[in-house]
Amino acid sequence: NKLSKSDLEKQLLYIRLSISTLLSNLWNEREESVDIKINYFNGGNSFLKNSISIGDFLVENAIWNDSKSECTWIAQLIDGKRIKLGMSNYTLYEYGGTIAFLITLSIETGEEKYFNTALGAIKTIERYYDNKLYEKKLSAYDGIGSLIYLYYKIYTVKKDYNYYLKYKKLIQELRVIEIQDNCIVDYVGGLSGLVVLLCNIYEYEKDDSLLKTIIKLSKKLLEKCDECNL
């Protein structure tokens, strides 16, 4: 049987992904710049049309389980100086950001296919997260804060109280988690970005439990600032 154009494009994508794992010393190589404009989109300067093109690509290339309840994407993940392939993760810095994008796109377009794909990806992540395959890093973009954001976003969009309870459970985990003295405090990978995220949610929730969590994390931030004479 002949491959359809869509199937052929998927096969080419998988080949490119596979070849990317052969590269080494990623940070030491730099391509010479070329004065060529690459047209990635056909939607002109319309941000929404271009976003729809990205969303359709993500929906088309999502890999679903047999029951169509969970999905993921083959992800390029940085592993030291090399690239490795794996399932998509929950961090906003990587595929959690993809999920957040799809949720927002569903709001802007009213198309449920984007939200359903985002939810399928969340369910895959939850299953592995429950099996302790993910670290609970104290970070908004590269840790537990990413899941907090995604759960809260789903709750605000769909008013699904189950996701509010999941969000609250993670807040409770933060309340009791032991913060290591050598914890990362920068905005992307550490405590400061997480505190900002929680403060933004507090603006809407006015929740005492959340406030206590913010105070706990902020005290640690102040301790680290004192250590650095900031």
Regions inferred by a protein language model and the residue ranges of each:
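Solvent-exposed loop and edge beta-strand segments that line ligand/cofactor-binding
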Residues: 78-95, 127-144, 179-191, 230
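Long, well-ordered core segments of solenoidal/helical folds
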Residues: 51-69, 116-133, 162-182, 213-230
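Well-ordered alpha-helical scaffold segments within catalytic/enzyme domains
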Residues: 35-42, 97-111, 146-160, 195-207
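Solenoidal tandem-repeat scaffolds enriched in leucines and small polar residues
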Residues: 185-230
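Short, conserved phosphate-binding/catalytic loop or strand-edge motifs used
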Residues: 143-147, 168-175, 189-194
